[in-house]
Amino acid sequence: MTYTRDYHNREFEAFSRAELASGGPDPQVKIIAEAITRLGGSDVEKTWRAGAFISAYTCGAAASIWAQLGWEDSSEMISAFLRMHGEYLPTRRERRTIWGADRVKWTKNLVSWSALAARVAEWKDLAYPALYDTISKNTTYFGRYATMKVIEVLHRAGVVAAGQTDIRPIGAKYPRRTLAWLFGYDIGTIDSDRNDDMALATVNAIAEDLKLKYAIESWFDFETLLCNYRQSLRGKYPGRSHDRELAHWRKAEPYWRPETQARWIPFYEIRAQLFPHEFLGEIGGWSGARPELEAALTRRHKGVVQHDTLIKKEREHGA
């Protein structure tokens, strides 16, 4: 069985509306931007905090790093801190690029970011393409999504003027493939090897109709929804990001003490303020991802996972 453009459009719309209603698609970005705004400080400090969060993708790690390290700290201090405490700094699998018991990659990442943060006055007013290039070229172990994500945090926190303005084609294989599903294109028609004007125009012309159709406010949210929809075919239910983040936060709490964590990121307070309470495990009584919801969504899309050629290839290669 081949799943059609109509099927994917219907399911993408249903998933996107539910994910947006939950406060997604990337609620951690909103939490961190709010926490940075509340803490105040200079643009350098705000920028450092944004990148420290991106290094691990969890609020629990961010609060701990913010409490113990600053942008002026030496690489030796950063390395010593990470080697001593890294086990209790939860990181998402998406940031496995900085994993390693010696913490060398994580140290390089934070050192490179602190150097860039110190010069934020030089680049904070750049237009999005130049801003993206500046961050991606000057930060070690920041890939495509990490660069997009830190720009979104800085934009929401009022540090940089530019938010995301397009879907950079290069490296965007998952959102690009979802666009191919939604429009019935072969993925080869959406170029993946360059970010020149023609490639950008092709991808963005395809995307703009959907972005407007579903009233999605930002390009960052739109691209994240494209990726999340693909993951929903394998069980990523609307609101799962909230559940995973709660589990990460609670992993860090016993080691760092709840009152210390909350002084830097009032996690539960911000979540209760920003998001519908029915999606929050600390209110509803669960403490992490809910397997029963993952299983239900996987069953719903069982045919897609079994029969869609692209999904099958990605599963075979562990994507």
Predicted regions and their residues:
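C-terminal accessory module of base-excision DNA glycosylases/AP lyases that mediates lesion recognition
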Residues: M1-L39, L116, V120-L131, M148, ...
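N-terminal polyanion-binding entry modules of DNA glycosylases/AP lyases
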Residues: M1-R93, H317
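Generic hydrophobic, helix-prone segments enriched in Leu/Val/Ile
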Residues: G51, D102-W113, V203, L225-C227, ...
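Generic structural signal for hydrophobic core residues of well-folded globular domains
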Residues: F53-T58, T139, L154, L179-F183
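Charged/polar, low-hydrophobicity segments characteristic of intrinsically disordered regions
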Residues: S79-T97, E208-T224
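Helix-hairpin-helix/helix-loop-helix acidic hairpins
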Residues: P90-T140
